[in-house]
């Protein structure tokens, strides 16, 4: 029996309050993508930067329609910073290495799409997906042999691409940038999926049910 993680109760309460107060907004000038995590190889951040660069290089009209926030630190930090400078995307891709929990919540609120481009099975679940989804954000993730593509489902709560598929990731970024209806629909579905499967209450209930079954010798 698999018991998935539950989203932190404080984060869920914050998301509930924010969504309740959120009013309809006019069309944004640009779509904000967000990555949260350690800047290490298996997270696939370099792939994300390459996909972003490839997309705006082939379709320059999209450059002013999208931005990317990278929240986190790690051993690849210097290399990733240099890549962004070399591609001239310093005004579209932004690094945030020291972020408080309160600031992280604001990043979740302000982003339009969350991206988890992990390329190795080391990414077993991707709890950050759930944290973004509870704020009604669609997810772009990768088809790893782990829990990652199970959390956010392709075509329902977001888009799933093959690990290390730069072109596929670029096309997913494009789709989410130009298709507002898709973002809205998948964002709503993402929120609903977390409420149904990934609350702390759900996790505790499944844990209780499992122990009860074991005690009974099931």
Residue ranges and their predicted role:
Residues 153-155, 159-166, 175-181:
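Conserved acidic donor-binding segment of nucleotide-sugar-dependent glycosyltransferases
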Residues 25-54:
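Conserved donor-binding/catalytic core segment of Leloir-type glycosyltransferases
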Residues 1-18:
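Donor nucleotide-sugar binding/catalytic pocket of nucleotide-sugar-dependent glycosyltransferases
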Residues 168, 175, 182-197, 206-209, ...:
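A short, well-ordered alpha-helix in the C-terminal region of glycosyltransferases
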Residues 98-99, 106-111:
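Short alpha-helical donor nucleotide-sugar binding micro-motif in glycosyltransferases
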Residues 109-124, 137:
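Acidic donor-binding loop of glycosyltransferase active sites
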Residues 134, 138-142:
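Short hydrophobic beta-strand element within catalytic cores of glycosyltransferases
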Residues 78-99:
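Nucleotide-activated donor-binding/catalytic signature segment of Leloir-type glycosyltransferases, i.e.
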């Amino acid at each position: 029996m698999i018991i998935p993680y539950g989203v932190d109760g404080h984060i869920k309460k914050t998301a509930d309050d924010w969504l309740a107060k959120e009013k309809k907004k006019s069309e944004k000038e640009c779509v904000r993508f967000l990555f949260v995590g350690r800047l290490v190889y298996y997270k696939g951040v370099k792939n994300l930067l390459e996909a972003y660069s490839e997309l705006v290089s082939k379709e320059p009209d999209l450059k002013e329609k999208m931005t990317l926030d990278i929240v986190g630190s790690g051993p690849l930090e210097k290399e990733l910073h240099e890549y962004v400078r070399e591609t001239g995307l310093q005004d579209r891709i932004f690094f945030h290495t020291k972020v408080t929990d309160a600031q992280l919540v604001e990043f979740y609120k302000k982003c339009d799409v969350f991206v988890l481009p992990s390329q190795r099975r080391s990414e077993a679940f991707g709890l950050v997906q759930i944290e973004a989804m509870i704020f009604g954000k669609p997810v772009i993730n990768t088809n790893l042999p782990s829990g990652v593509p199970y959390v956010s489902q392709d075509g329902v709560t977001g888009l799933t691409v093959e690990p290390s598929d730069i072109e596929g990731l670029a096309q997913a970024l494009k789709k989410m940038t130009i298709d507002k209806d898709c973002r809205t629909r998948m964002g709503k579905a993402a929120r609903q999926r977390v409420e149904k499967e990934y609350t702390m209450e759900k996790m505790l209930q499944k844990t209780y049910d499992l122990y009860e079954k074991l005690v009974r010798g099931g």
